[in-house]
Amino acid sequence: MYGGDEVSAIVVDLGSHTCKAGYAGEDAPKAVFPSVVGAIDGNGMDIDDAANTTEDAKESDKEKGKRKLYTGSQALNFRRDQMEILSPTKDGIVTDWDMVDNVWDHAFRNCLMIDPTEHPMLLAEPPLNSQQQREKSGFSTFYRC
């Protein structure tokens, strides 16, 4: 039975410890995973690294510039030489937008298994977020979705 208020809006909360994503109107988020990203600089990657990655890690990795980024519990728990665990936020403010895009992409594509262009989006943000951070967040979400 259709209640009339059922929309397929996606709610994303990128916290300093965990990222939570799910559908608006549901009691609990569908995806809860660490909001940290594993990063390997371009000079730290070797040929054997690509052969040792699991299928889940390959799906959630993204190469940005000269570093390879890994997001999600399975990708982070897989041992890789010279991988550094980094947080995209500091004191609740986003400091690395490439990492945030990687976290959002993991939430949409791997956890929720949706195309973000087909859903309205609600992003949680810190109450003391600056206007510049708010604009960057909206810009990034608008152009990637």
From Swiss-Prot:
Stretches for region Disordered: 47-66
Parts forming coiled coils: none
Superkingdom field: Eukaryota
Basic and acidic residues bias (residue ranges): 55-64
Gene3D superfamilies: 3.30.420.40
SUPFAM superfamilies the record matches: Actin-like ATPase domain
Pfam families: Actin
Free-text tissue specificity from the UniProt record: Expressed in roots, leaves and flowers.
Family the entry assigns: Belongs to the actin family. ARP4 subfamily.
Protein name: Actin-related protein 4A
